[in-house]
Amino acid sequence: LVIETIENIATKLSISISFKTDVTQTLIDITEIDLNAQDKILIRNTNAVINIKSKVGLTPLHLATLQNNLSVSKGAYLNDGDANGMTPLHYAAMTGNLEMVDFLKWTPLHLAILFKQLVIELLAKTFFDLAIENGRLNIVAFAVEKYIAAR
């Protein structure tokens, strides 16, 4: 009954769903999915896996970051990169989303990525570089302030 309900909701929302055999975890294949539809699926199905990835490596947190939506963040891996290695923090910096940048925490890994220290990057550019290129001076100032405070 749970699987049928989820399948019906998914069909109405044009979402592709696949299931594991043990039904304790439901895998949602995110193709091009409306975030509000994603929230509805996650709310209705508490067994949904939050750290799954689309074919291009996007997680629900990547999509949530693009829409300044913190509702799908609980239990999500903050450092998961997409197919190009871009984390939700990269996306938040590119879009100038200071609230999401602050929410995504300043872990030692993010500080290392910020200044290209001790990290082999999958991308030639860090989220800091992307913020500069996109004229997101609020993100640049915030990042520098956090870096100085962490020293």
UniProtKB/Swiss-Prot annotation:
Major subcellular site: secreted
ANK repeat segments: 21-37, 41-52, 56-80, 84-104, 105-116, 117-125, 126-146, 147-151
GO terms under cellular component: extracellular region; host cell presynaptic membrane; membrane; other organism cell membrane
Note: Iso and Leu residues are assigned by comparison with orthologs.
Domain comment as written in the entry: The H8 helix is predicted to insert into membranes and form pores by assembling into tetramers. The helix is contained within a helical bundle domain that undergoes significant conformational changes during pore formation to allow exposure of the H8 transmembrane helix and transition of the toxin from a soluble monomer to a transmembrane tetramer.
Entries under InterPro entries matching the protein: Ankyrin_rpt (IPR002110), Ankyrin_rpt-contain_sf (IPR036770), Multifunctional_ANK_Repeat (IPR051165)
BP GO annotations: exocytosis
GO molecular function, one term: toxin activity
Keywords, alphabetical: ANK repeat, Cleavage on pair of basic residues, Exocytosis, Membrane, Neurotoxin, Presynaptic neurotoxin, Repeat, Secreted, Target cell membrane, Target membrane, Toxin, Transmembrane
Subcellular location: Secreted; Target cell membrane
Similarity comment: Belongs to the cationic peptide 01 (latrotoxin) family. 02 (alpha-latroinsectotoxin) subfamily.
Subunit organization: Homotetramer in membranes.
Function according to Swiss-Prot or TrEMBL: Insecticidal presynaptic neurotoxin that induces massive neurotransmitter release at insect (but not vertebrate) neuromuscular junctions. Native toxin forms cation-permeable pores (with high permeability to calcium) in lipid membranes locust muscle membrane and artificial lipid bilayers. May bind to insect neurexin-1 homolog, insect adhesion G protein-coupled receptor L1 homolog, and insect receptor-type tyrosine-protein phosphatase S homolog, and induces neurotransmitter exocytosis both by forming tetrameric pores in membranes and signaling via G protein-coupled receptor.
Protein name: Alpha-latroinsectotoxin-Lh1a
Pfam families with a match to the protein in the record: Ank_2
Highest taxon of source: Eukaryota
Protein source organism: Latrodectus hasselti (Redback spider)
Expression (tissue specificity): Expressed by the venom gland.
PANTHER family named in the record: ANKYRIN REPEAT-CONTAINING, PROTEIN HOS4
